[in-house]
């Protein structure tokens, strides 16, 4: 039986889920990794004060994964619930994350993990929202394309619940650029709901909505390698967005991530991979798309030229730090920045307007996006968000 699994950010197809991580040998390999490489002592953990009856809960799931086997969705759900309820030690968490990466995370495992994150998060109760987000890790150092696109999409009448964080691997995360634009990024779920109702746009700062992540953060920082959490973030939008544009730098993640979104009940989504390794719809290469629509997966490829846009170069969309990228975003919305930077925003916005049903095609979406910028409506959305979030 063929089994598909995700290794951090890579997908492995193999004939069986068995691996070298079996029995005592597997446990020894992982413990040596934790002690010698990650610097996490397995004998001294933050949860040492917990009674043994609580600290042993995760062990049966650790054994399954360390034996090279995969968790069922229900087992993955229970394991993540233990972790995000502060009932596991740092070493146990590190062991599980490392073993999962070495084995390769399955669609069922990611689905189970994501369901727990969505249950534990502070929720924003507004229906019909869209999120446009990337997994990161494409190493392109591009400006904040999806954040800039959010203003264009909202100007066209689609509610955007932009979920994001500060920079981790790049110079500027969504939170960094919005803060530099004058947006107050910290918000309660009530404030976010008000913003979505009043102006059709809100930034959902991940740290404000995922308090249970504090039980995982220190371990992730100490491990210092990609884990399943790198792809869980986009799957846990506090508004449970009905529509999504989700970019990845790895084409092998397209179909698995699409299937996870289907498991989570997404209405329509577009998983995108720029063939130049961009986790956005690319202006400098064809883009491979896996569209989720009506419970079906449709895979196809698009090019900038298909929509009357001139192909650019990756160097044309390189960004800066938060302040520099804020200037790029404002320049595009004001109409002073043209060329590839504007065009890639039009392309990504156009795809979003198509996937949420505001436009009947990507081509129509691109034209609508251009109208939103040229009319000043997209810039007005930025000004409205700044004013609303800073209101006393």
Which residues does each predicted region cover?
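Short, small-residue-biased leader/transition segments that mark boundaries at the very start
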Residues: 1-13
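Acidic, glycine/proline-rich low-complexity segments that act as flexible tails and inter-domain linkers
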Residues: 51-142, 154-156, 160, 311-319, ...
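Active-site glycine-centered loops adjacent to acidic/histidine catalytic or metal-binding residues
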Residues: 16, 137, 233
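Acyltransferase
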Residues: 17-51
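Acidic, glycine-rich active-site loops and adjacent beta-strand->loop/helix elements
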Residues: 134-139, 164-170, 209, 275-276
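Glycine-rich anion-binding loops and their surrounding alpha/beta cores
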Residues: 119-122, 142, 157, 179-186, ...
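Catalytic-loop motifs flanking and including active-site residues across diverse enzymes
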Residues: 25, 29, 145-149, 173-174, ...
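A glycine-rich phosphate/pyrophosphate-binding beta-strand-loop-alpha-helix module
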Residues: 97, 143-199
């Amino acid at each position: 039986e063929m089994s598909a699994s995700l290794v951090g950010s890579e997908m492995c197809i193999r004939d069986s889920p068995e691996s070298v991580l079996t029995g005592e040998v597997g446990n020894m390999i992982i413990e040596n990794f934790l002690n010698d490489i990650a610097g996490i002592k397995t004998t001294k953990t933050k949860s040492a004060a917990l009674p043994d009856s609580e600290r042993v809960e995760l062990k049966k799931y650790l054994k399954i994964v360390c034996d090279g086997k995969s968790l069922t969705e229900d087992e993955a759900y229970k394991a993540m619930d233990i972790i995000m309820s502060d009932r596991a030690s740092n070493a146990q968490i590190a062991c599980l994350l490392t073993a999962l990466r070495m084995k390769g995370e399955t669609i069922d495992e990611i689905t189970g993990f994501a369901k727990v994150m969505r249950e534990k998060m502070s929720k924003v109760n507004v229906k019909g929202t869209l999120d446009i987000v990337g997994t990161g890790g494409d190493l392109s150092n591009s400006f904040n394309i999806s954040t800039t696109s959010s203003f264009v999409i909202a100007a066209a009448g689609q509610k955007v619940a932009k979920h994001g964080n500060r920079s981790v691997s790049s110079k500027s995360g969504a939170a960094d650029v919005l803060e530099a634009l004058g947006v107050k990024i910290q918000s309660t779920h009530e404030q976010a709901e008000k913003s979505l109702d009043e102006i059709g746009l809100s930034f959902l700062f991940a740290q404000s909505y995922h308090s249970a992540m504090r039980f995982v953060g220190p371990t992730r920082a100490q491990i210092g390698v990609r884990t399943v959490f790198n792809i869980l973030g986009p799957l846990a939008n506090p508004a449970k967005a009905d529509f999504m544009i989700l970019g990845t730098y790895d084409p092998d993640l397209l179909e698995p991530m699409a299937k996870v979104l289907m498991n989570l009940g997404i209405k329509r989504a577009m998983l995108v991979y720029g063939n130049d390794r961009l986790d956005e719809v690319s202006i400098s290469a064809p883009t491979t798309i896996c569209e989720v629509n009506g419970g079906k997966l449709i895979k196809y490829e698009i090019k900038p030229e298909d929509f009357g846009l001139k192909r650019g170069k990756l160097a044309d969309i390189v960004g800066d730090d938060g302040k520099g990228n804020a200037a790029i975003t404002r320049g595009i919305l004001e109409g002073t920045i043209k060329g590839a930077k504007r065009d890639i925003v039009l392309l990504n916005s156009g795809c979003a307007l198509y996937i949420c049903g505001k436009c009947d095609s990507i081509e129509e979406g691109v034209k609508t996006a251009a109208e939103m910028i040229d009319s000043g409506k997209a810039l007005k959305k930025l000004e409205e968000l700044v004013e609303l979030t800073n209101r006393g």
